[in-house]
């Protein structure tokens, strides 16, 4: 870990007691900062609060008292999920206090090179693939997957050395609070409509994503999806070397598919059909990952080994089990329509779809044609169930069932299925109407599947 003086004797407010907040607080204390932690929920009796107080932090929970700012903070570090219209964040901005997120702190102390991945969909799978590739028969050091993937960046940054690589998944929420992050390789998987409730406009969302390249120089690399015209235009914003990846053959300058083969800069790597996980989206994830791995000097052998054996990431098109001729899949990470579109295109078998969740004000009309083509029955729950039911009717789906809870949706889906069908949870919505996280939603689905198949 690099020792920096930036926060020595500086007064820092950490907003949010999530994983990233707790770990950032510990690191800031190590760096000599005077830290106050604030969380709106009452967490007085939690182990995290006791631990941070024992380390020397001031912890205030149960409300967001704006009067705290009279203490004169130099920095505010916020949990990525806390919006910029939060009263505490708004007050910091009003007072011209830098509002930062954990990746900023982690990057400042990290000795390791960063390979950073962002995008609307495919981030976690691509991050995981890159880390696996870079760790294959690695002689020195380790590639650590961290960030939005669930492992706090500041925790990993403290132990990573110059021989290591940090493969970091960075969300738009995290990137908004960065000023110095400079990945050796930045990867942009795609950009679709997402998180407009947080960012306000699509333009704000796109520019948050593009902060991943804001500090890159000509010695760095920007791996970008060349099949999306918007991303080709956005690539002009970087000073880094642009390395396209293309499933559709729109470019042969980076990673691409040609004659059924995965290729990199004219070199054939392996057949597309040997990729172990299904779906066109996973071909794109594989291309992005192999480009990053090659740019970091990894061998074709490592890429082939990983892509032919990788079984997927939990909650992302995860195969749960087969029972009575039905195959159950958990795609709880599908928190937007585009992710569900990708899931529907991945199967040739008839699908019984379970969908629904937080209402973010979207229309689901773009799903109509895919529902018509792939879905035989649909089970809906959550805030968006009526909106999705209307779209399903327009798609001509005859079996549409509305329930209150996900636990009711699973037996209903089984009842609507027959041998040879796929039963797929792919909600097309965020989970926060009924669950704290998409992981919790996926776990509830898996438990419900186990209950009806015992």
Swiss-Prot record:
It comes from Latilactobacillus sakei subsp. sakei (strain 23K) (Lactobacillus sakei subsp. sakei). This is UDP-N-acetylmuramoylalanine--D-glutamate ligase. One of its GO terms (cellular component) is cytoplasm. It holds the Pfam family MurD-like_N. Keywords: ATP-binding, Cell cycle, Cell division, Cell shape, Cell wall biogenesis/degradation, Cytoplasm, Ligase, Nucleotide-binding, Peptidoglycan synthesis. HAMAP family: MurD (MF_00639). The keyword Disulfide bond does not apply. Cell wall formation. Catalyzes the addition of glutamate to the nucleotide precursor UDP-N-acetylmuramoyl-L-alanine (UMA). Its main location: cytoplasm.
């Amino acid at each position: 870990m690099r020792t920096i003086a930036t926060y020595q004797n500086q007064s820092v407010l950490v907003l949010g007691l999530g994983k990233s907040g707790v770990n950032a607080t510990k690191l800031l204390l190590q760096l000599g900062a005077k830290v106050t932690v604030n969380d709106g929920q009452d967490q007085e009796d939690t182990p995290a609060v006791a631990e941070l107080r024992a380390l020397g932090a001031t912890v205030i929970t149960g409300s967001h008292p704006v009067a705290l700012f009279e203490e004169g903070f130099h920095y505010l570090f916020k949990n990525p999920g806390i919006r910029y219209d939060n009263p505490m964040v708004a007050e910091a901005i009003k007072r011209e206090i830098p509002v930062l997120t954990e990746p900023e702190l982690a990057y400042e102390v990290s000795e390791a090179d960063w390979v950073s991945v962002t995008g609307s969909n495919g981030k976690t799978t691509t991050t995981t693939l890159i880390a696996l590739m870079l760790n294959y028969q690695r002689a020195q050091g380790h590639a650590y997957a961290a960030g939005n993937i669930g492992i706090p960046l500041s925790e990993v940054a403290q132990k990573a050395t110059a021989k290591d690589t940090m493969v970091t998944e960075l969300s738009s929420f995290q990137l908004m609070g960065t000023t110095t992050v400079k990945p050796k390789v930045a990867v942009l998987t795609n950009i679709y409509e997402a998180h407009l409730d947080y960012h306000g406009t699509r333009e704000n969302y796109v520019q948050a994503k593009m902060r991943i390249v804001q500090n890159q120089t000509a010695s760095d690399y920007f791996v970008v999806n060349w099949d999306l015209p918007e991303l080709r235009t956005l690539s002009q914003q970087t000073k880094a070397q642009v390395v396209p990846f293309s499933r559709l053959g729109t470019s042969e300058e980076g990673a691409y598919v040609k004659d059924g083969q995965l290729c990199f800069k004219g070199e054939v790597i392996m057949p597309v059909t040997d990729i172990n996980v299904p779906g066109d989206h996973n071909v794109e994830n594989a291309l992005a990952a192999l480009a990053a791995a090659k740019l970091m000097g990894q061998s074709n052998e490592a890429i082939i080994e990983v892509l032919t054996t990788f079984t997927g990431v939990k909650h992302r098109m995860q195969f749960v089990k087969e029972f009575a001729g039905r195959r159950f899949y958990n795609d709880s990470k599908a928190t937007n329509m585009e992710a569900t579109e990708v899931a529907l295109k991945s199967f040739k078998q008839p699908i019984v779809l379970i969908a629904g969740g937080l209402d973010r004000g979207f229309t689901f009309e773009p799903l109509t044609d895919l529902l018509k083509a792939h879905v035989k029955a649909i089970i809906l729950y959550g805030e968006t169930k009526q909106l999705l039911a209307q779209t399903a009717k327009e798609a001509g789906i005859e079996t549409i069932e509305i329930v209150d809870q996900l636990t009711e949706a699973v037996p209903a889906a089984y009842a609507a299925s027959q041998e040879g069908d796929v039963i797929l949870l792919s909600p097309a919505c965020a989970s926060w109407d009924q669950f704290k996280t998409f992981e919790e939603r996926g776990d509830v689905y898996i438990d419900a599947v186990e209950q009806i198949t015992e």
